[in-house]
């Protein structure tokens, strides 16, 4: 499995670069979230996929710990943004572009984006910060993808 991770990253990065024609960190929300976690987070993004009951696709039940709670809050944030700030869009917030950058080791959402894009960026920024703050609680036994 460990040899697949670098290959997965290389393929993901290649797709990331090849699917963009804009500034270095302007991508569709899922790519933004992946790279925001990769660059601004304490753990690789794939360490959270399948973690607990809420990290990754779907989400149900009670969070198993504070890491899983971060993912639950993120899911709710996306839902709220999809209903409110992005309600006029006819697509899921996971596929709306936004801009962000790092400044003094902090994630900054671009204020020139639409209200919708800024709200999505804030959801992603908040989860990365939440995951970082609760990193001590990360327990590999809760990761269904690797455990």
Swiss-Prot record:
Keywords: Calcium, Cleavage on pair of basic residues, Disulfide bond, Hydrolase, Lipid degradation, Lipid metabolism, Metal-binding, Secreted, Signal. The active site is at residues 74, 124. It is found in: Secreted. PLA2 catalyzes the calcium-dependent hydrolysis of the 2-acyl groups in 3-sn-phosphoglycerides. GO terms for biological process: arachidonate secretion; lipid catabolic process; phospholipid metabolic process. Residues 1-22 form the signal peptide. PANTHER family: PHOSPHOLIPASE A2, PHOSPHOLIPASE A2 FAMILY MEMBER. Disulfide bonds join 55-71, 70-130, 77-123, 86-116, 109-121. This is Phospholipase A2 Scol/Pla. One of its GO terms (molecular function) is calcium-dependent phospholipase A2 activity. It is an enzyme of class 3 (hydrolase). Its cofactor is Ca(2+). Expressed by the venom gland. The keyword Electron transport does not apply. Its EC number is 3.1.1.4. Residues 23-28 form a propeptide. One of its GO terms (cellular component) is extracellular region.
């Amino acid at each position: 499995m460990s040899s697949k991770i670098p290959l997965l990253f290389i393929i993901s990065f290649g797709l990331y670069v090849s699917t963009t024609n804009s500034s270095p960190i302007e991508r569709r929300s899922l790519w933004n979230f992946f790279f925001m976690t990769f660059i601004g987070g304490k753990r690789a993004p794939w360490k959270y996929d399948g973690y607990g009951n809420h990290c990754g696709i779907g989400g149900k039940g009670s969070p198993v710990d504070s890491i899983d709670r971060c993912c639950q809050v993120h899911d709710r944030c996306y839902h709220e943004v999809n209903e409110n700030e992005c309600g006029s869009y006819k697509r899921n917030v996971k596929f709306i572009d936004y801009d962000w950058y790092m400044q003094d080791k902090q994630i900054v959402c671009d204020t020139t984006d639409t209200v919708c894009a800024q709200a999505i960026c804030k959801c992603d920024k908040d989860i990365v910060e939440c995951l970082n703050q609760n990193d001590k609680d990360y327990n590999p036994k809760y990761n269904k993808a690797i455990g």
